[in-house]
Amino acid sequence: MDEALIRKQEEELQHTGRYYKHICFLCVPLLFVSCYLYGLRPLLLCGFALLMGNLCDRLISLLRRRVYRPGDYSNESFALVIALLMPATVDWYVLAAAIVAGVLIGKEVFGGYGSYPFNPAAVGYAVAAVSWPEQVFRYPPPYTSIPLWDASGVATASTISDTLRSGGLINLSGLSLALGEYAAPMGAGSALVLVACGLFLWVQKDIKLSAALSFLVTAGVIVFLFPRQLGLTEDASFAVSAMFRLRCVRDELLTGAMIFSAVFLLNEPYTCAHHRLGRILYGIMVGAFTMGFRYFGVYETGVCFALLAVNSISGWLDRTEVHLYELLHSSWKKQTGKGDAV
């Protein structure tokens, strides 16, 4: 492996390595909630994912003839994020294939640490979603007894997104939605725990809130203006219609792994835009694309596909912002020079 690239990756690891370590640590409270809702199988799945991520890292080190870096937790964090986006009944081979695709195709093919243009966790999830949709988008109800090894016989429920897509209403309280007491991915249901994780990352200065907030605000505005249940309020007053629209916003933002993606996917250091205006535009575009996928697509977790689409231009957003600032600065200098000359 090229020595210059190795040195560059080691320098990048010094700057962003703690982010991936914190992501791994923050998966623990989500895992506790998942085990409370679904038993011990989520613990085995996440342990398997952690092992797979580490083995992929060691395999790549061997193939590239470089020393294994024990302080690099990026592959493990991607593997855990993929696992927590899966249902508790997912088969082992589906999870393994998603992790291998995320680490090898999403990360290592592009050069490894810090060189990939697409979020590896989103890549792995997208591969599994397209290849095995019946495994990825069917979730067991909470408090279901799930066997540890073979969960093929467990009854799975239709997703909340199916109800929303058909124009129906969710018959769940706001507290149940916030606690994750509905059929959802293992780690993406409990909004309260996810918000706490996001605040921790922000306090630790691992993430910026601009991308996540612009993402959620954009999605919320689209839902408020164009709810999928609009026909239910045709003859209602303005106040009733506004309250109904706010309920639709709540239902859309608390389901479909929206909060999870805002915390664990959107702010990945090497796929998110780096400048403030770029991050805001990045979040707006991901939010708009996500609602487009949710309204007109066939997959529940459209945010991963939207994220991959916007990842392709995140670098362009940064470069455009830099060029814009340079243009404004040069224009201001010219105007100042003219003023001084007069």
Can you say where each PLM-predicted feature lies in the sequence?
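Cytosolic-side transmembrane-helix boundaries in multi-pass membrane proteins
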Residues: 1-22, 293-342
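N-terminal signal-anchor module of multipass membrane proteins
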Residues: 1-61, 337-342
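Structural signature of hydrophobic alpha-helical transmembrane segments
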Residues: 39-51, 89-97, 177, 181-191, ...
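Alpha-helical transmembrane segments in multi-pass membrane proteins
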Residues: 22-29, 45-57, 74-79, 83, ...
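Long hydrophobic alpha-helical segments that form multi-pass transmembrane helix bundles
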Residues: 115-195
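Membrane-interface helix-loop-helix junctions at boundaries between adjacent transmembrane segments
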Residues: 71-151
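Loop-to-transmembrane alpha-helix initiation sites
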Residues: 117-121, 250-258, 279, 297-310
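C-terminal ends of transmembrane helices
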Residues: 7, 55-67, 103-114, 196-205, ...
